[in-house]
C-alpha cells in the first residue's frame, strides 16, 4: 500500500527546507535513496534495520524497502478556504494525502520574515486549522442536507451518515477539527474514511527549531505541546536547516558524528517516517528469499488475506493459507528449512492477524 504525506504550513516556516532535507540521498542513511518525481513530490524509503538484517542473511538479488511519498504543498495563506492565493490547489493536494505534516516555525531569525510579523507557532497552527475547518464545514453542510433528506425518506445508511455529519458540524462550528469527534463504532469509522474530510486526517506537528534546540526543544515547542495535547497527534522536533546541511556530507560516519554533536541518535527524517507509521497505525511484514527481500506495509490488525492482497490482488482472492516465521526466529536460525525443522514455521488461516515483523509466504489458488 502506498503512503503519501503532505507537508503544509504558512510561508517561511521551513516546509521546503524540510522537503530538501528529506530529498537528499543521504538524508537518512547510506542506503536510503530519494527519488524526485516532480519538483514538489518525492518518494523516500522507510528505514527498517530488520530488512537490512534479512538481506545480510538471505543475500538476495535485490532488496526492496517500503516507501513513503512526500509532497511539498505550497504555503497556505489566510483565505485559502475561499480560493485565495493557491488555496484551491492547496486544499486539493491535502485531500490526496494520507497524513499531514504541519510544519511550525519554532525559531527566531531576524533574516527570515514571518508573514504575521512575529514568531508564534500556536497562532500559525490555528490559522491553518481555521482554513481547513471552514472548507470542511462547507463540505459537511452540503452532504448533511442530502443525507438528512435521504434518511428521512427511509435510507438507513444515509441516516447513519447524517448522524455523524451532524456531530462533525457541531465540532467545526466550535472551532474544532473533525478528528476530535469520537467515532462510536467501526461502521462510523468506515463512513468517516469515505468522507475525505481535511481535518479528519492524522497530523504530525513538525516543530522546526534552531540548531541549539534540536535535542531538547524550546519554549515554542512546549507551547505547541500544550496546544495539541488533546489531539492524538505526533510531535517531531527537528532543526531542518542544520539537518539538511548535514545530509549533504558524503561520509555516513561523519554525518552520524554531527548528529551526535546535536544530541541526536537518529536523523529527524528517520524519526519523521517512524512517527508517520505510528500516526497511521501501520506496520511491516516481510517476504524473504534468495531472489528478493522486501518490506510490505499494512495496517495494524490486518489479517493474512489482506496482507496477501498487498502483494497481488490474486493472492487475496485465492488465499489458501500463510506460512509464518517470526522475525527473531528467522534471524536466530537463518533459513526457512531450519525454522521448519525447529517447529518455528506456523501455518495460519484466513483469520490470522498479522504481527509486525512477520516473515510470510502465501499459498493461493486462482
Task: Annotate each language-model stretch with its function.
Residues 1-113, 141, 147:
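Conserved G1/Walker A P-loop phosphate-binding module
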Residues 2-8, 13, 19, 146-355, ...:
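C-terminal-of-GTPase-core extension/linker across diverse P-loop GTPases
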Residues 16, 33, 69, 119, ...:
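Generic signal for short, ordered secondary-structure residues
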Residues 30-31, 112-116, 217-219, 249:
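Short amphipathic alpha-helical segments
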Residues 34, 48-51, 61-70, 84-98, ...:
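Amphipathic alpha-helical transducer elements in NTP-driven molecular machines
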Residues 42-47, 74-84, 95-156, 174-184, ...:
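Conserved Switch II/interswitch segment of TRAFAC-class P-loop GTPases
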Amino acid at each position: 500500500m502506498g503512503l503519501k504525506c503532505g507537508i503544509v504550513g504558512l510561508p517561511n516556516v521551513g516546509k521546503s527546507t524540510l522537503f530538501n532535507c528529506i530529498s537528499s540521498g543521504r538524508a537518512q542513511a547510506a542506503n536510503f535513496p530519494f527519488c524526485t518525481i516532480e519538483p514538489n513530490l518525492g518518494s523516500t524509503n522507510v528505514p527498517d534495520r530488520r530488512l537490512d538484517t534479512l538481506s545480510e542473511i538471505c543475500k538476495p538479488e535485490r532488496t526492496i524497502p517500503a516507501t513513503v511519498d512526500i509532497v511539498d504543498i505550497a504555503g497556505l495563506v489566510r483565505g485559502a478556504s475561499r480560493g485565495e492565493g493557491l488555496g484551491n490547489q492547496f486544499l486539493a493536494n491535502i485531500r490526496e494525502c494520507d497524513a499531514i505534516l504541519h510544519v511550525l516555525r519554532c525559531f527566531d531569525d531576524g533574516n527570515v520574515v514571518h508573514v504575521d510579523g512575529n514568531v508564534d507557532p500556536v497562532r500559525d497552527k490555528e490559522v491553518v486549522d481555521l482554513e481547513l475547518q471552514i472548507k470542511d464545514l462547507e463540505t459537511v453542510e452540503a452532504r448533511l442536507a442530502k443525507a438528512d433528506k435521504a434518511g428521512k425518506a427511509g435510507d438507513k445508511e444515509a441516516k447513519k451518515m447524517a448522524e455523524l455529519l451532524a456531530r462533525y458540524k457541531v465540532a467545526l462550528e466550535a472551532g474544532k477539527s473533525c478528528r476530535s469527534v469520537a467515532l462510536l463504532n467501526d461502521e462510523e469509522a468506515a463512513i468517516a474514511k469515505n468522507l475525505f474530510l481535511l481535518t479528519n486526517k492524522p497530523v504530525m506537528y513538525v516543530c522546526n527549531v534552531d540548531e541549539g534546540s534540536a535535542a531538547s526543544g524550546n519554549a515554542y515547542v512546549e507551547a505547541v505541546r500544550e496546544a495539541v495535547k488533546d489531539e492524538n497527534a505526533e510531535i517531531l522536533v527537528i532543526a531542518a536547516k542544520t539537518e539538511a546541511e548535514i545530509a549533504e556530507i558524503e561520509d555516513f560516519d561523519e554525518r552520524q558524528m554531527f548528529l551526535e554533536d546535536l544530541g541526536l541518535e537518529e536523523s529527524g527524517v528517520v524519526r519523521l517516517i517512524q512517527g508517520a507509521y505510528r500516526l497511521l497505525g501501520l506496520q511491516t511484514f516481510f517476504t524473504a528469499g534468495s531472489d528478493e527481500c522486501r518490506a510490505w506495509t499494512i495496517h495494524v490488525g490486518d489479517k493474512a488475506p489482506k496482507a496477501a492482497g498487498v502483494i497481488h490482488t490474486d493472492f487475496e482472492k485465492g488465499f489458501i493459507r500463510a506460512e509464518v516465521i517470526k522475525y527473531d526466529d528467522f534471524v536466530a536460525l537463518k533459513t526457512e528449512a531450519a525454522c521448519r525443522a525447529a517447529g518455528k514455521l506456523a501455518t495460519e488461516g484466513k483469520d490470522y492477524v498479522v504481527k509486525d515483523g512477520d516473515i510470510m509466504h502465501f499459498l493461493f489458488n486462482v
